[in-house]
């Protein structure tokens, strides 16, 4: 069974620090206030946040462990279903160890580049 499509989402051309409306929307989607600063990097066509990019360090100086978060409720449900059905294992098997290792290295590079000096 295929899930119905969601309205198209688009990447933000240039992410800006979250507006007050973005902060309120993300807090509602998470069910709590975000721990640190973030930018909305993907939005639904109507402007609602879909993916946020977290600042690499939380206000208290602790590193933020997750750089990007999917916050859209419908897409989170769909991803959760895929994960519960073994989708992560299938995807990892399809792309192979070398591609996964390269993806992890690129993530580390982007994370490290964003860290304050």
Question: For each predicted feature, which ranges?
Answer:
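A generic structural signal for short, non-catalytic loop/turn and secondary-structure boundary residues
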Residues: 44-45, 63-65
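Short N-terminal edge-element motif at the start of the domain
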Residues: 1-54
């Amino acid at each position: 069974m295929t899930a119905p499509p969601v309205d198209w989402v688009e990447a933000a051309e240039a992410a800006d620090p979250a507006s007050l409306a973005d902060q309120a929307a993300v807090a509602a989607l998470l069910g709590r206030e975000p721990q640190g600063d973030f930018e909305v990097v993907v939005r639904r066509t109507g402007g609602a946040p879909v993916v946020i990019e977290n600042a690499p360090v939380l206000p208290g100086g602790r590193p933020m462990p997750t750089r990007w978060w999917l916050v859209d409720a419908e897409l989170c449900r769909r991803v959760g279903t895929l994960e519960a059905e073994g989708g992560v294992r299938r995807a990892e098997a399809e792309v192979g160890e070398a591609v996964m290792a390269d993806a992890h290295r690129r993530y580390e590079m982007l994370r490290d580049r964003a860290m304050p000096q």
